[in-house]
């Protein structure tokens, strides 16, 4: 038996190594400034899937475009089908006879060629059927109007791929990076019919930048402030920008109109600026000038200082209120005792009435039984008279009627205990002690007063101490928001 238990323990210790210890993980897809977590996937569950909104992807790519002056997906007047180009597969050169053609050089004449064209030939963008790798084993996708479903094998998580539009003359619009990661506690919200709301949950680099900025702000205030970050819509987001960096003229398409823009000419960040802010139109634009940083609204509040403790005498009002409370309790107890006494007498009278009603019902029941016996005798006599005609019922040509009188309800009524025994009065204790009614009530009142006195002696000091500290707790320090017009 001992050898069996030892073998079983060793098996459970090495079982995770044999079967594989796959912690919950996923594949994170990064587009521009936002990250999208796939459904749970690992080597044991190798399919990583996403459901993406093409308009949201365009907004992500526009905030941090890999190429200047790209035509966004939202600018199209019709829905075109897409091509998915994995970067771990080299495109075949079909020499102009198939899906991809090196002779079609118009898309490659752009200053920023198609993403991945450094190692590939340029893709063909004519009207063709399904792309070559739409149904590959490692990656496949389906497109439903403005929504995209991508399935990726976990072994290929860590590579990048491109999405292009099947329309001549349009630029590539999406460059997707993937990397393995752990599942977040809650998925970032993806709101439909909105271009930028999904970046309310920043990706991991954005969170680290925000924490670094908060750390820098606290250092500048000698850690005497509390930082509060508000979750709000993008219309209330703030922008921190450097007026020393010029914006190219004319500016590109406006992407975001913040509610507040703070210039920071003397602020040195531990990281680079991420976006381009145009002060003339008060908007984030698509130009790659990198002079601003988008932040959720946050406020600085002074840290409250602890006041000195002062010992005070207990106010007279506290003693007065305590005495009034004890007097009210004693008066209430006496009134309750008198009410209980009158209630007991009332129960006794009601019990007598119920007993008399029960006796009357029993007598009526006995009379009913005698009447039933008399009717049965008459029935038997009439049946003998009409014996030749088959009995009384056949002679009258009617259905025979019988009496069914039960004694169960009357017996239950007689067996019920007295009403005084069924209703709890006083404390619910059966203590007669050979005393009269008023003596028992006085004894209960005395025990109640002693219990209240012990409760006041035990809990009184604690209650008085809490009441003494109550005025100091009511006075809260005043918190003021950061001045929007002050320079950082």
UniProtKB/Swiss-Prot annotation:
Segments on the Extracellular face: 21-442
Transmembrane feature ranges: 443-463
Residue numbers covered by motif CX6CC: 393-401
Cytoplasmic side: 464-488
Domain notes: The 17 amino acids long immunosuppressive region is present in many retroviral envelope proteins. Synthetic peptides derived from this relatively conserved sequence inhibit immune function in vitro and in vivo.
Protein name, entry field: Envelope glycoprotein gp62
Gene that this sequence comes from: env
Role: The surface protein (SU) attaches the virus to the host cell by binding to its receptor. This interaction triggers the refolding of the transmembrane protein (TM) and is thought to activate its fusogenic potential by unmasking its fusion peptide. Fusion occurs at the host cell plasma membrane. The transmembrane protein (TM) acts as a class I viral fusion protein. Under the current model, the protein has at least 3 conformational states: pre-fusion native state, pre-hairpin intermediate state, and post-fusion hairpin state. During viral and target cell membrane fusion, the coiled coil regions (heptad repeats) assume a trimer-of-hairpins structure, positioning the fusion peptide in close proximity to the C-terminal region of the ectodomain. The formation of this structure appears to drive apposition and subsequent fusion of viral and target cell membranes.
Keywords: Cleavage on pair of basic residues, Coiled coil, Disulfide bond, Fusion of virus membrane with host cell membrane, Fusion of virus membrane with host membrane, Glycoprotein, Host cell membrane, Host membrane, Host-virus interaction, Lipoprotein, Membrane, Palmitate, Signal, Transmembrane, Transmembrane helix, Viral attachment to host cell, Viral envelope protein, Viral penetration into host cytoplasm, Virion, Virus entry into host cell
Region of interest (Immunosuppression), residue spans: 376-392
Signal sequence coordinates: 1-20
Region listing for Fusion peptide, in residue ranges: 313-333
């Amino acid at each position: 038996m001992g050898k069996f238990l030892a073998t079983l323990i060793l098996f459970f210790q090495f079982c995770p190594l044999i079967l594989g210890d796959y912690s919950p993980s996923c594949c994170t897809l990064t587009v521009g400034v936002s990250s999208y977590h796939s459904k749970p996937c690992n080597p044991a569950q190798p399919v990583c899937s996403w459901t993406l909104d093409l308009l949201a992807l365009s907004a992500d790519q526009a905030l941090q475009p890999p190429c200047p002056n790209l035509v966004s997906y939202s600018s199209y007047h019709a829905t075109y089908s897409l091509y998915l180009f994995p970067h771990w597969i080299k495109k075949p050169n079909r020499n102009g006879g198939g899906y991809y053609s090196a002779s079609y050089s118009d898309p490659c004449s752009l200053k920023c060629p198609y993403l991945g064209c450094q190692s590939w030939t340029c893709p063909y963008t004519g009207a063709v059927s399904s792309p070559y790798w739409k149904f590959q084993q490692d990656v496949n996708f389906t497109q439903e109007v403005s929504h995209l479903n991508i399935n990726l094998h976990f072994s290929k998580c860590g590579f990048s791929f491109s999405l292009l539009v099947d329309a001549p003359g349009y630029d590539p619009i999406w460059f997707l990076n993937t990397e393995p990661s752990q599942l977040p506690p809650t998925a970032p919200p993806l709101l439909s019919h909105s271009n930028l709301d999904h970046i309310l949950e920043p990706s991991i680099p954005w969170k680290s930048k925000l924490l670094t900025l908060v750390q820098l702000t606290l250092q500048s205030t000698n850690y005497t402030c509390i930082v509060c970050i508000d979750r709000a819509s993008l219309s209330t987001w703030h922008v921190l920008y450097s007026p020393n960096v010029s914006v190219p003229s004319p500016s590109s398409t406006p992407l975001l109109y913040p509610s507040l823009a703070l210039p920071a000419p003397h602020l040195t960040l531990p990281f680079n600026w991420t976006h381009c802010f145009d002060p003339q139109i008060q908007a984030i634009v698509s130009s790659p000038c990198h002079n601003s940083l988008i932040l959720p609204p946050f406020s600085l509040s002074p840290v409250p200082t602890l006041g000195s403790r002062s010992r005070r005498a207990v106010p007279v009002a506290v003693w007065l209120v305590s005495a009034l409370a004890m007097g009210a309790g004693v008066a209430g107890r006496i009134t309750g005792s008198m009410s209980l006494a009158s209630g007991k007498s009332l129960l006794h009278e009601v019990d007598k009435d119920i007993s008399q009603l029960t006796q009357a019902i029993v007598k009526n029941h006995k009379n009913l039984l005698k009447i039933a016996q008399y009717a049965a005798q008459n029935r038997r006599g009439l049946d003998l008279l009409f014996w030749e005609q088959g009995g009384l019922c056949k002679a009258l040509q009617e259905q025979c009627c019988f009496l069914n009188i039960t004694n169960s309800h009357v017996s239950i009524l007689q067996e019920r205990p007295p009403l005084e025994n069924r209703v709890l009065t006083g404390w619910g204790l059966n203590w007669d002690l050979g005393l009269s009614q008023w003596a028992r009530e006085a004894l209960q009142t005395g025990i109640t007063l002693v219990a209240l006195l012990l409760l006041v002696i035990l809990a009184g000091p604690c209650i008085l101490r809490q009441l003494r500290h109550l005025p100091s707790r009511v006075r809260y320090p005043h918190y003021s928001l950061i001045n929007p017009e002050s320079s950082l």
